[in-house]
């Protein structure tokens, strides 16, 4: 009985159990965070390897708008860090109440599209430089 109780309790401590998510995007929070529905559950996702302006920072509205136009209401596929992402070995699989994941829309890397749009920066500490577009684009250390 103790084991069952511990297993049930542990399931509520983790934001998600699965590591591979396929679902519809419900809402975009900013240029690197969104909420999706996968397997009947709401999952908050932090896109790994990039950094976009937060609410109250310059560029927030543009970054959130670009991501929203790209994915809101659409089905995306997200792999949580540790499941073969560009951020494996560099990032934790969770951050606060979110999973950290590499996400795709129709097999197109969403993080790459955000950096190409100029609304998000490569964060090489976590991406290994995967999303660096050029020496003149922004880059987080």
Regions flagged by a language model, labelled:
Residues 3-12:
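Sec-dependent N-terminal signal peptides
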Residues 15-141:
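Small beta-barrel nucleic-acid-binding modules, primarily SNase/OB-fold domains
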């Amino acid at each position: 009985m103790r084991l069952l109780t511990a297993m049930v309790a542990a399931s509520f401590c983790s934001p998600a159990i699965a590591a591979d998510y396929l679902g519809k995007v419900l809402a975009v929070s900013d240029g690197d965070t969104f909420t999706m529905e996968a397997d009947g559950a709401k999952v908050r996702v932090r896109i790994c390897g990039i950094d976009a302006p937060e609410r109250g920072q310059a560029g927030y509205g543009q970054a959130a708008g670009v991501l929203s136009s790209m994915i809101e209401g659409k089905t995306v596929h997200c792999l949580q860090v540790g499941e073969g992402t560009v951020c494996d070995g560099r990032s934790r699989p969770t951050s606060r109440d979110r999973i950290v994941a590499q996400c795709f829309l129709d097999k197109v890397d969403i993080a790459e599209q955000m950096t190409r749009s100029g609304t998000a920066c490569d964060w090489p500490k976590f991406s290994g430089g995967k999303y660096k577009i050029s020496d003149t684009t922004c880059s987080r250390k």
